Amino acid sequence: MSGTPILRVERLTREAFAPFGDVIALEGARHFPINGGTTERFHDLATIDVCADGGRPLVSVFRAQPRAVPVAITLMERHPHGSQAFIPLAAVSRYAIVVAPAGEFRPDAMRAFLAEGWQGVNYAKGVWHHPLLALDAVSDFVIVDRGGPQPNCDEIPLECAWALEFEPACAGAEGLS
């Protein structure tokens, strides 16, 4: 992939992902016991923003096929009327995330993250992102996003394909570059 622009993949953390939305994870989350102490509630993990302009929340399941590495990033999409959350159903598979800030798309502002199977993400309204990038296995995700009368998905092709480069600091990144 000589001459191909490279996007370095970093480990997904709440702090690094904050400009794009929320990391949905139990680690570091506010929690408290409920139901007579038999259940622990991890509370308010993401800001779901879907109700403006007659929108309503939808819950769906996406089944993602694993992508072959190297992964070519050729398009981005955004949801201008609502947020979109991805919550893995099994904590065994990693997935890659490519995002860019809301507003006019700028390829030089893209960032990439490696999510562990126990981490979900919630893209804020209007944030550019690549479609789901499962890496290790067929992976099921619960999706919370917006239903409503307006179209809610804008896609743009990239002028050239970008390649993901997985940093060694990403736990278990060996075998992904």
Curated annotation (Swiss-Prot):
Disulfide cysteine pairs (residue numbers): none
Keyword Lyase found: yes
Cofactor(s) demanded: Ni(2+)
Record-listed E.C. numbers: 4.3.2.3
Reactions it catalyzes: (S)-ureidoglycolate = urea + glyoxylate
Gene Ontology process terms (BP): allantoin catabolic process; purine nucleobase catabolic process
SUPFAM superfamilies tied to this protein: RmlC-like cupins
Highest taxon, organism lineage: Bacteria
Keywords: Lyase, Purine metabolism
Complex and partners: Homodimer.
Family: Belongs to the ureidoglycolate lyase family.
Function, as annotated: Catalyzes the catabolism of the allantoin degradation intermediate (S)-ureidoglycolate, generating urea and glyoxylate. Involved in the utilization of allantoin as nitrogen source.
UniProt protein name: Ureidoglycolate lyase
Species this chain originates from: Burkholderia cepacia (Pseudomonas cepacia)
Source species taxonomy: Bacteria, Pseudomonadati, Pseudomonadota, Betaproteobacteria, Burkholderiales
Primary gene name: allA
